[in-house]
Amino acid sequence: MSNITARQTLTRDVQSVDALVRQACKAEANATLLLGTGLLNLTAVDDKDTVVGYLSLDDVSCTRLGSGGPGADTWVQQAAASRFKLGSTAFVRVCATAHLSEIEASAALLRTAFLHMPSLQTLLMVAGGELSFTEPGLAAVFSRVGAHKESGAVLYEAGRDAVVPPLAIRPARVEDHDDMLPILQRCEVAFPALAKLPEASRPHEPFALTRVVAGQDERNRVLVAEAEGRLVGFIVMTSDVDTGSLAETFDLHAYDNFLPPEVYEQQYEAARDSVRGQKLAMLRHQRQQEKEAEGEGAGEAGGQGGNGGVSAGMQTDPEQGEDGEGAAEGEGEGAGEGAGEGGAAAPGTGADKADDSEEAEAQLLAAAEPTDEETRAEMLAMFAGQAPPADPTLFAVTMLCMDPAFEAQAIEFLTPAFAAYTDKLYCVVTLPHDSREPALMGTMTRVAPNPGSLFPEVLFMFHRHALIPDFAVRLGEPGDLDAVASLVAGMPNADDIVASFSGAAAAGSAAVALCQGELVGLVTVNPEVDLELLQANFGLSNHVDLGYQPREQHGEIDMYTMNPIFVHRHRTLVAATMRLLGKTALYYALPPGQQPPDMLEVLEQVAPRHRTASDKQLQAEFALYVFTRQAAFKRRRSVNSQIVVVGASECGLAVVERLLLDPELQFNYLTLLAPGGIKVGGMACQFTAGVIARLGLEARVMLLDAEVIGLDRGSKLLDLSDGSQIFYNQLVLAAGLQDQSRYRFAEADPEVAGLLVTELELAADFSMNDAMVMNSILVYGNAMGAYHSLAVLEAKGAGEKTRFVAPPGQQPPLVGVLHALAGEAGVALPSPEPRDLAGLSVVQPVGPELHASATLIDPADPGPREELPVDLVVGCEPPSVSRSLFTCLNDASLVFDGRLVVDGAFRTNDPAIYAGGSLAKLSRRYGGTHLEHYNSRDVGSRLASSLVSFFNAGPDEPQPAATAAAPPPALHRARAVGCSLPGGNYFVYAGCPAALQRPSTAAPEGGYEMKTASERGLTRITLDGEGRVHSLMYLGRVAVNAPRLGSLVGLHANYLNSLAPKYQAGDIKCLLSFITEPWSELLYNESFPELRETLLEVALAELSAGGREVDGGMVEWVTHAQDAVLEFARAHAAELPGYTMPSAART
């Protein structure tokens, strides 16, 4: 009998599922529709991946497909009402199995359904008759609970225990050793961190496991699990936990620092009082200093004026002695009489002073009130390193070993574990960052570390009350306001949450989660969604199918909160909310700088579109996440490895983007080192400021403004320029090549560093006000960035104040192409003066604008030296490797041969260190090619894919050998470069890697060249000998999108609407206009390469199958290709507004 397993249904299963359902149920299922609307869809496959079963669950009452007669639907609603609880009950909408595999397929489907949804307790199914004879696999677990005579419908029920028999768990005995040992040995490979025997058991000696079992006491416990008459797992626990180190490393205040609540409150109040006292003393000291300063000022004023006022009257001349005192007394009597006659002014003044004093004291007390962050920091300072005053409220799991077939049931250990520790509230597990997560971690809460923590492990927590199975979801009501206010009390945005819930509850767009009747979570939804805005900025078609999901089925999450104890119920709450509100997709928009909600990890991030509409009204400045019916219970596997990406270059950003958007893995510890911040810009940049905002880096990536100054490969530790350190498990070097002028001159005179900027810094920060106050600006270097800098300075009004110099012989090849095109187009370009910048030093300013002096030398006559006063120097030399980074890498013994050498998987000679972008080159085994000639985003994406493949190995599979030879990377996308030019022109050069290695205006050998000159500018396209686009050049007054034009490079000319024949016939007057006509929009779509690969695969399959007619034409392929293109256009209709769909293809 073949091995049958069940998994979530994939899009590629749709045709096979529809055929199976048609055969088994004699009905049409429309699996595509069910994928978007069902609660959970599972497919059973045999060991040949043949579909042999399909199960679709729903959370509304329904009859099973192919069952039930007239009146059955109404009867089901009534009969199942008392048994159905949203969040823990589901209906079987479709269950179809191959006849010969019914028992095995049914068992696999039902078991997977319950294990996939931990909250699911009961399945209900309405069949058209008895199951016993027709479907014995279902009959074995479903019990009949009702029937409807008129329709012939029968209601069946299956509980979790009937499908997934609970494990028999008991304390371990010494004689269990022989059964426990094989499980331990298997887990030493799959999960070594949880299969590590304690040192006290002498793990290197025989029978160490026996000693662990024999050493049980009230603090150390061992439990074993049995199923089907055999031992299938064991767990080792201890209540001897160092909570002090955990409190110093992790934010545990939501869990009372694992102390009894009354002890935590005492410590909290003590710390609060301490902070209040310190702040009050400081504020009073400041107030006293201010009073003294005011008094000194008043005294000076009294000495200068004719009337000393009150303070002058109180002063006594020391020479007066007793006479002076008597005089004062006499004056006082007279004054008293006058005051009496004048009314009650004196007493009133005293009262006012008292009131002012009380008010000032109240203001001091209010200002001294500690914040929660200050109190927590003080708690750490006061109690760190001290023994806890009471037993902590937790126990720790130190070992967990399970048979793979029962690993998903490991959570069943927790109930007897808490029973063994009756006084404990929390169970914790720590895992090294590079360890895989077993299934149990999916039900636990990952605790956030404190900023700057170097603790080498990840902490997971589970609360005793999270085991309560009574969890339900219903619509929110106005009467829930008090419970909501209690739930969110103490949160910074508590008032906003309450206000949002109040409005949403009144409108019927709020849902609440209840545990034993107590409100533990809530969500409010905005039923209106701007789909046009979302489609214009994000790849929405990868997550939802608007053809099947109309506008009213989309909503946006406004507010969300859940008691930390129940965070493992996020999916249940959101999925139930969707059903209650009739939605198939819920979105969450996260603006930059906003704290992400806890439930973000159950949402899927929607990829930002890099090529968006130019309409500013359709520009989104937020990251978008989505929760769909199709992916409601699709869990991405967590990766806790600390991945550090060095450099916010296009390659580095592409690595981060690919990891964030991976559909199968969730990377929880990403760090990006971006010295000076993330700087993007330029017409050829593939990451605009809008794309960065839509990536939402702040939500899931730690951004550090620091450079690497030290690398310890042995400890996997980086020293940073800000004095901090950071550990890594995988390090990605993507700093790229940079202009080194700043570093070279700053070594001689550190003060000049502030005068040197790069072209990106100039474009981002230089203003017209700067142009007005500066008198002399030097652009140094002849890289392409120099011309962009000149254009920026010209546009800001500083063109006349700019001098352009460069060392002779420094012209890069692409600049030569630029000048050649400019000559053809009749465009005058500035040429640099041949000068060397011999020195740059800060001088004492004669005027406010003079900052430094630049020493220029003419290489043809090096004797005379010109001293040029400069206010700003723009470094535009050909980029090279940072000297400090090179020193760091060289000291770490990484192989460097002009560039950092990598293999086909982008690994350096250290398998934990990867490199890409212009910093790296392939090893000689792969031709030694410099990666700077390739598309940086493509390189970064491929590098990230190499990381993903490393983490994708299964728990029983060894991860890919670090020394294994990887195939060469498949890099095909063109690289586009370009810049704005002085005079209002623009230049673009896009080419394949071969074209970038040897840039030229001519076609390659055996190729073909096309050129047009029009009022829009000069456009040149070259084809190689195979008819593919080799390079594309443009110089003119149109600000074209360089990466967009680059997407045409590598395509055969046949894709370009018969480009070559039309050009030869003289029908094309302007190449730029022709390749940007509406017909070309499909070619520019970011998903078009995937469509092209699909078409090529189908064509190759047809050829391999001998699918040819007598005249050599492809059989059926053309029809399949047309269908694929129409389906692509339908799914991406919002991104292709210029395309009109045939009526037959719209559904």
Curated annotation (Swiss-Prot):
Residue ranges of coiled coil: none
Keywords, comma-separated and alphabetical: Cell projection, Cilium, Cytoplasm, Cytoskeleton, Flagellum
Annotated Gly residues bias: 296-311, 335-345
InterPro entries recorded: Acyl_CoA_acyltransferase (IPR016181), CFAP61 (IPR038884), CFAP61_dimer (IPR056299), CFAP61_N (IPR032151), FAD/NAD-bd_sf (IPR036188)
Acidic residues bias (residue ranges): 319-334
Compartments (UniProt record): Cytoplasm, Cytoskeleton, Flagellum axoneme
GO cellular component: axoneme; motile cilium
Any GO BP annotation: cilium organization
Annotated region (Disordered), positions in chain: 282-362
Function as written in the Swiss-Prot or TrEMBL entry: As component of a spoke-associated complex, regulates flagellar dynein activity by mediating regulatory signals between the radial spokes and dynein arms.
Quaternary structure and partners: Identified in a spoke-associated complex containing CFAP61, CFAP91 and CFAP251; the complex is associated with the radial spokes in the axoneme. The complex associates with Calmodulin; the association is calcium sensitive.
Name of this protein: Cilia- and flagella-associated protein 61
Organism placement in taxonomy: Eukaryota, Viridiplantae, Chlorophyta, core chlorophytes, Chlorophyceae
